[in-house]
């Protein structure tokens, strides 16, 4: 084994282990396994044309040279992105820490208490600063949060408004341009009409159901929306506000002047700009709207012994359960960045946050005074951080731009000739003086002696915040680096991640996030670039984006790529919007139905609804495949209305369906398009591709197939790849003048993630990617062979093999022992493992996806654990142990119970805590017992201030 190649570091199975595994599976070679697993008519005939694989050192040099092409000017463009200081203790211990960035969404709450507490901190920060009682634990970005607010208000229309068909959304003209563009994209398929104008001039009419305003607004002006909000409420309209989260440390918060929803970006709470993302959007609202709010909510609960703990609350709202009835299609959001923003607030505390906000405001105030003295006219009387400057007659915008660039400064240039300056926490006296100097040079005015910037500046009384915030003790205690580091580590020890053991979640692809892929993200040249700088200042990013797009086109067999969607769900929505735009362009806008197999992930029907379609379910047969006759019958019956088929390949049942090309042909014969859900692309790369099977568009999950981390629930990236005829309808961006189908705030979405995937593809090369896919299929079939006798495998392909994942049968176990798949998942925690996917796509089962990154030793240990758990279940079935008091129904067993004085169970502590030798050698201690889900939903406590007393 040549260990110096990256592929051999990434792939867990060595050549010497291959014969043993193949023998267990019952094949003679990897090629034979693939030929018996994937239909012959879709196998690629030639290797991917991706160039030779780079070594880790070569990639480090390459990505370093690209980074050096980015020019880091001092940037005061603002418009939703601002330079900030990421505390080193947070960067080192969270952002660069695999325990935090390789963990999964905290559905298994007992082994996720650390990040659940961190996310509850974030929710508390948002709730306090907005003065609204309920916040979620992040959305994708500010613009998509605005679209979610619009959809939520539309769904909250009164019966009278629905009867009157009120469908007008008023958006104030002083909202960020990219936010308005994303709102428009969402509004069209939902049947909303967007009316843009000045809130001051609005006359409320019965057809208006909601309003969106910005605070401070696009020009930096702080507006008093109290009277406007009262007028809206008087006629039954809701009001949502996009609020600068840092400004709310000084300004009257939206909740105090009547807003129903507040949303925005938490980027300036310590998250770098990353050329547009990722950063965590926030969303807060009133308690009565908790079941209508998008995104995940963390809440308090208790474990079975009454200890306070954390969990994801109100999960039945989510798209994977509600499907087409869900209020949102959001799954992955921005958990890692929300965690960082929460820690930023913990580290600084209320006084520190206020000091930072005061500094920002004071710099802006100082600049306003000095610029006025030079003859410039301020267009916004009340401001927080942003000045809109009218130039004197003797100064042109081009002169200002030229002088600014000569001083390596970026400003914002409005279409009417005004200039914008948005300062931030990094802006120093020297920076502000240099800004002043460039305006003095432009006006040919001498620089007079200027006073120092004060520590704070006055805020007009009507806008001044008087209420307190961040009063919980967590925001008072950890202000030294030592204490902060220990707090982070204390939380970290409560969570299972890929740093601990395999996470075998089916359809989630929890593969290695290699250090060599992650390291570039800590380079300032990738971290600190504003997304709206001139392209020549982002040459490194532009080259990377071009190269990665070409790689993804090659891998998928498609002609075009958009990197804009910020998650897989966003990719689904975007792909469907592209289909709709194409069909409208050829006079087929009447197509309104999307066929979706019954086995599909709930995001598919939820995304279809968001894109303005009506889902139509087609059946699956007893083997888990799409029922071809049902598909054909429904497609032909609705031939003129059918827009698309959404299909996952390999299927959500873990099978490569033999008839996939015929399925696509049936849809195309009806004049419709095929959307391939790329969630399972890890079973395709290098062996087949969406273009070959006959799809027209697919999304990819970079956080699954292409090695970017899950981050405990985000960030994700969901780029879409499309066939030639769909390329003209890919998303544009307001900054380029192309407003078509814009779906995220930044032109390239979460561009800061892209170096990870680029590194993965460059270092794996075509052969490495192909071998990774082969190994993923090998590992899944090995586990199936090892566990089939103990549990049973629900679905197999026609030759008896599974794809890159497989479904374990647990329903018979439940019938005979009373032990559920949930009990098995909780018992796995005692063994140091995260559960596989529960009850999806088949109720009462466990879906397992080992990925290519796991070693044979880890696979064998997992098999030992699963077999041992099956033996524990057998003891219940035979009556050897108590059906009501055993290691499974009582799992997990927290440390405090194991070491406690009282022990009332009929089995010993050692059996509970150390069931096999591998656990004795490396025990992961759990800090809570099984959590009461009902209590946490019945009484939602979504901040750190909650209490069940």
Segments the model singles out, each with a brief description of its role:
Residues 135, 193-197, 379, 412, ...:
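General small-molecule cofactor/ligand-binding pocket signal
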Residues 27-41, 259-264, 695-698:
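TRNA-binding/sensing appendages of the translation machinery
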Residues 114, 144-309, 371, 384, ...:
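Conserved PLP-enzyme active-site core in the AAT-like
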Residues 132-133, 557-559, 587-590:
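Short helix-loop-beta connector
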Residues 1-24, 36-76, 85-101, 107-110, ...:
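Non-catalytic terminal extensions of PLP-dependent enzymes
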Residues 105-115, 121-123, 136:
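N-terminal export/assembly segments and adjacent metallocofactor-ligating motifs
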Residues 271-284, 288-289, 333-337, 422, ...:
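Conserved phosphate/anionic-ligand binding catalytic regions in large, soluble enzymes, centered on
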Residues 125-146, 165, 169:
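A conserved hydrophobic secondary-structure block that centers on an alpha-helix together
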């Amino acid at each position: 084994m040549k260990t110096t190649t990256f592929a051999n570091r990434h792939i867990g199975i060595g050549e010497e282990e291959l014969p043993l595994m193949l023998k267990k599976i019952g094949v003679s070679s990897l090629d034979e396994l693939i030929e018996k697993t994937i239909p012959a008519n879709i196998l690629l005939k030639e290797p991917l044309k991706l160039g030779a694989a780079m070594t880790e050192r070569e990639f480090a040099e390459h990505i370093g040279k690209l980074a050096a092409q980015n020019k880091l000017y001092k940037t005061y463009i603002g418009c939703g992105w601002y330079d900030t200081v990421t505390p080193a203790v947070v960067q080192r211990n969270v952002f660069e820490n695999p325990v935090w960035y390789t963990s999964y969404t905290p559905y298994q709450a007992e082994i996720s208490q650390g990040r659940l507490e961190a996310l509850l901190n974030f929710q508390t920060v948002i709730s306090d600063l907005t003065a609204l009682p309920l916040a979620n634990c992040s959305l994708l970005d500010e613009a998509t949060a605005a679209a979610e607010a619009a959809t939520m208000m539309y769904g909250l229309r009164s019966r009278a408004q629905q009867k009157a068909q009120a469908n007008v959304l008023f958006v104030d003209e002083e909202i960020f341009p990219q936010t308005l563009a994303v709102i428009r994209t969402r509004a069209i398929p939902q049947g909303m009409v967007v009316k843009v104008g000045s809130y001051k001039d609005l006359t409320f009419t019965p057809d208006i159901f909601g309003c969106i305003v910005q605070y401070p607004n696009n020009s930096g002006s702080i507006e008093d929306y109290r009277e406007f909000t009262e007028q809206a409420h008087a006629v039954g309209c809701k009001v949502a506000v996009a609020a600068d989260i840092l400004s709310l440390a000084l300004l009257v918060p939206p909740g105090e002047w009547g807003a129903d929803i507040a949303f925005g970006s938490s980027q300036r709470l310590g998250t770098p700009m990353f050329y547009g993302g990722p950063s965590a959007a926030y969303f807060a609202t009133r308690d009565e709207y908790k079941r209508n709010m998008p995104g995940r909510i963390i809440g308090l609960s208790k474990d079975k012994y009454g200890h306070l703990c954390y969990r994801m609350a109100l999960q039945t709202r989510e798209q994977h359960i509600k499907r087409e009835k869900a209020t949102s299609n959001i799954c992955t959001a921005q958990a890692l960045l929300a965690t960082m923003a929460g820690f930023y607030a913990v580290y600084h505390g209320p006084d520190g946050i206020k000091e930072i906000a005061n500094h920002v405001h004071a710099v802006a105030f100082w600049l306003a005074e000095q610029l006025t003295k030079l003859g410039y006219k301020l267009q916004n009387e009340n401001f927080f951080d942003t000045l809109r400057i009218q130039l004197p007659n003797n100064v042109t915008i081009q002169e200002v731009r030229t002088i600014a660039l000569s001083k390596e400064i970026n400003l914002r240039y409005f279409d009417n000739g005004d200039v914008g300056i948005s300062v931030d926490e990094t802006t120093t006296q020297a920076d502000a003086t240099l800004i002043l100097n460039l305006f003095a040079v432009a006006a040919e005015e001498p620089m007079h002696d200027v006073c120092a910037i004060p520590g704070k500046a006055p805020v007009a009384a009507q806008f001044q915040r008087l209420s307190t915030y961040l009063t919980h003790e967590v925001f008072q205690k950890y202000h030294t680096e030592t204490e902060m580091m220990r707090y982070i580590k204390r939380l970290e020890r409560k969570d299972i991640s890929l740093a601990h053991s395999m996470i075998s979640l089916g359809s989630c692809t929890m593969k290695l996030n290699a250090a060599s892929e992650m390291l570039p993200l800590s380079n300032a040249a990738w971290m600190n670039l504003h997304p709206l700088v001139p392209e020549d200042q982002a040459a490194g990013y532009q080259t990377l984006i071009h190269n990665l797009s070409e790689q993804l086109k090659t891998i998928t067999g498609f002609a075009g790529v958009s990197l804009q969607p910020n998650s897989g769900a966003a990719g689904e929505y975007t792909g469907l919007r592209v289909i709709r735009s194409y069909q409208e362009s050829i006079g087929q806008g009447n197509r309104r139905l999307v066929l979706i197999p019954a086995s599909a992930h709930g995001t598919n029907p939820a995304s279809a609804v968001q894109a303005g379609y009506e889902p139509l379910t087609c059946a699956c047969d007893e083997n888990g495949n799409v029922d071809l006759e049902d598909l054909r019958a429904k497609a032909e019956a609705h031939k003129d209305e059918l827009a698309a088929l959404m299909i996952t390949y390999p299927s959500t049942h873990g099978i490569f369906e033999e008839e996939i090309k015929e399925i696509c042909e049936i849809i195309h014969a009806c004049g419709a398009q095929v959307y391939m859900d790329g969630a399972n692309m890890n079973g395709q790369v290098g062996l087949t591709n969406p273009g070959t099977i006959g799809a027209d568009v697919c999304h990819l999950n970079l956080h699954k197939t292409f090695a970017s981390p899950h981050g405990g629930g985000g960030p994700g990236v969901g780029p879409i790849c499309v066939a030639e005829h769909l390329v003209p309808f890919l998303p544009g961006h307001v900054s380029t003048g192309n407003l078509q189908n814009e779906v995220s705030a930044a032109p390239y979405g979460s561009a800061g993630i892209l170096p990870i995937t680029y590194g993965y593809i460059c270092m794996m090369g075509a052969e490495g990617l192909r071998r990774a896919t082969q190994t993923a299929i090998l590992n899944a079939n090995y586990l199936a062979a090892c566990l089939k006798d103990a549990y049973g495998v629900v679905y197999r392909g026609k030759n008896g093999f599974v794809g890159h994942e497989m479904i374990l049968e647990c329903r018979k176990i439940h019938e005979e022992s009373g032990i559920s798949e949930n009990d098995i998942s909780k018992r796995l925690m005692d063994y140091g493992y995260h559960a596989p996917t529960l009850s999806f796509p088949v109720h009462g089962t466990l879906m397992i996806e080992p990925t290519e990154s796991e070693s044979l030793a880890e696979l064998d240990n997992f098999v030992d654990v699963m077999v041992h758990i099956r033996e524990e279940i057998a003891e219940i079935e035979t009556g050897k142990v108590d059906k009501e008091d055993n290691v499974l129904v009582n799992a997990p067993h927290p440390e405090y119970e194991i070491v406690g004085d009282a022990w009332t169970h009929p089995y010993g502590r050692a059996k509970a805590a150390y069931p096999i030798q591998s656990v004795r050698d490396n025990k992961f201690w759990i800090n809570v017992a099984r959590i009461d889900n009902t209590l946490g939903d019945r009484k939602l406590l979504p901040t750190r201030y909650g209490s069940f007393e």
